[in-house]
């Protein structure tokens, strides 16, 4: 059963990432700026600095890899920091019922998508390890 929940979440979330990233280039006016001054200022700062364009490019690339079900551990690792900012924006900077729902769904989708790949992330939590300084692939 979880396999179907996983794949449904992957398609929905991947589609959302692709859509959200592409809409920035198709119709820039579509971008929600928020209703609270902090959310508006934050979004303007991202846009004015040029960082927002790179985030949207990443959203497109990662949405495609998620929909194609390729490089999932790397895709998820790249999406989590972006999601942390989005959840913060939804829950703290621009709090409203719809934003709470989107923030909560982002967390749920992340957990559902990360769970089957958890074994790939365990090595990242090694407290002390031996580095391999050789030039040969591991």
Tell me the role of every PLM-derived stretch.
Residues 43-58:
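Interfacial helix-start motif at the membrane-water boundary
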Residues 36, 59, 131-132:
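Glutamate identity and glutamate-enriched acidic tracts
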Residues 13, 58-59:
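Residue-level signal for transmembrane alpha-helical positions in Major Facilitator Superfamily
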Residues 26-46:
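Membrane-interface interhelical connector segments
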Residues 46, 67-68:
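Alpha-helix C-terminal capping segments
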């Amino acid at each position: 059963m979880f396999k179907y929940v996983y794949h449904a979440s992957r398609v929905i979330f991947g589609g959302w990432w692709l859509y959200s990233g592409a809409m920035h280039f198709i119709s820039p006016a579509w971008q929600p700026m928020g209703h609270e001054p902090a959310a508006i200022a934050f979004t303007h700062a991202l846009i004015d600095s040029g960082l927002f364009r790179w985030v949207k490019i990443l959203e497109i690339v990662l949405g495609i890899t998620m929909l194609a079900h390729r490089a999932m551990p790397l895709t998820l690792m790249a999406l989590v920091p972006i999601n942390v900012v989005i959840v913060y924006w939804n829950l703290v900077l621009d709090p409203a019922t719809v934003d709470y729902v989107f923030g909560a769904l982002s967390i749920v989708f992340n957990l559902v998508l990360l769970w089957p790949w958890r074994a790939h992330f365990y090595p990242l939590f090694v407290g002390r390890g031996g580095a391999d300084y050789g030039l040969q692939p591991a």
